[in-house]
């Protein structure tokens, strides 16, 4: 069976058998949440979506697939018109799912992979940071927050701020930064690029409510930010990405800050090779969000998510 997750940043598809073996997987960057200030999915994003579906239609019978769409399509005014055209051209029916169902399917996919890796345990918490929303869940709690890697970055109001006397002082005497214990203040006085620091501080603002509800020592992360980070640490190029290379990897909070800083300084051509086309700024934004969100939790990376959950729900006869 082919399960399709049409997200706010990527379209992900998986061909799975009834034993939950993944026979083939596909991923396309469609960035549907990009330039949605007027409440409409842009013509450029629609074209990227249709291009992705055309490629899939040449490999699979889309009339037999199960497809779901998430946050950007929940919010867009032109979702119905887009889906009518898709059904007419590809015979594919798409179901817009609510945040609770999205979290349920994402967890279903993650848990099955954790069981395969013998990493599943009780009292795990889950975080799925998408393009336009972030779902945080555990056995007793599930909530969707109105920030994602694209929507967060698109809302940034970058300002041209000149370094003040303190920044100039610490730039000349960087060792003195060690005496500042407050981490945010240390960043404020650092010589990091101005826009980098603005993303850093805004990330702490947007996650305030989510952080209050954050419970648990072990979190499973399954979105493109942690998976790309893990691949990048292993020097794996975007085109050579393999799910097996990231599944079960453990990350620490500081990994996200370090990743954001490294790719900030990565030239565009290399960024395209290692991160994928036009993903650099959104990965920086997402890394800052996850750095701000977590503290000392153990973070487990799993590639599986909604697309796998769609297939597993079908085979287990779970209604959604």
Report each predicted region and the residues it spans.
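Short glycine-aspartate micro-motif
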Residues: 1-5, 124-128
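Ser/Thr-glycine-rich phosphate-binding loops at phosphate-binding pockets of nucleotides
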Residues: 8-10, 110, 130-136, 224
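Short N-terminal binding/cap micro-motifs at the start of the first secondary-structure element
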Residues: 10-14, 35
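Conserved hydrophobic/aromatic positions in well-ordered beta-strands
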Residues: 14-16, 137
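Beta-strand initiation motifs
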Residues: 20-24, 143
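A structural signal for short, well-ordered beta-strand segments
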Residues: 24-30
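Helical "lid/coupling" subdomains associated with nucleotide-phosphate turnover
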Residues: 31-55, 73-76, 80-123, 138-320
